[in-house]
Amino acid sequence: MRNGYKRIAMIGLVALAAGCANSVSVRPGAEVTRFHLGNNPARGEIAIEPLDPALRGSFEFSRYAAAVERQLATLGWRVVQGSRSEQVALVRVEQSTREAMRRESGFSIGLGGGTYGRNVGIGGGLTLPIGGARAGQIVVTELGVRLQRRSDGAAIWEGRAQGEAVAGTPAAARAAAVDRLAVALFQGFPGESGRTIRVR
């Protein structure tokens, strides 16, 4: 009889674990915020450079730059190499994980971010739900791009896009995530300044 109780208890634990795994919630699409002065930037030659100089010339950054280049080319820019262009796109990619919570939670506290190096005013931060059971991890990827003049460093346009994926899935890979975020970030360019939207 005691073994029967143990078996029932084990079945219950397995069912509970399965229920938690199935309740992992990933926010769909990308959260996008853009900032600009209200005018549509003039197109021309532009170079794509990492916000972190240590990434310059790296294979990792070349994959991010390619995603941004595709979007800029679609919008009418001509991407060039080197430092001869007056316009430059500074690119930043950050990735972290958070514990996924049960879908029923429904209550969260937004942890606001700040500015990043070189006074790039792109907000960051994560929203961490409160309550609910642990059910794995979510990978959070953020892409930030700042278009500026090389001569004086003045910002022309800047924005950030943040998306989520379940850890261990192809969608959570950095390169794949940046590809999706670049499309979302430049959709409807230049976008409404100062407004955060969700692009699906």
Model-derived segments and spans:
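A structural "domain/chain start" motif
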Residues: 2-7, 20-75, 84, 194-200
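C-terminal/domain-edge helix-coil "capping" segments
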Residues: 20-38, 131-200
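Envelope-exposed proteins and targeting segments
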Residues: 42-44, 64, 75, 85-89, ...
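Extracytoplasmic/secreted proteins, especially bacterial periplasmic and envelope-associated proteins
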Residues: 63, 67, 88, 176-184
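Structured segments of extracytoplasmic/periplasmic soluble domains
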Residues: 67-78, 96, 184-192
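Acidic helix-start/capping segments at beta-turn-to-alpha-helix junctions
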Residues: 80-100, 200
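Surface-exposed short loop/turn segments
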Residues: 92-152
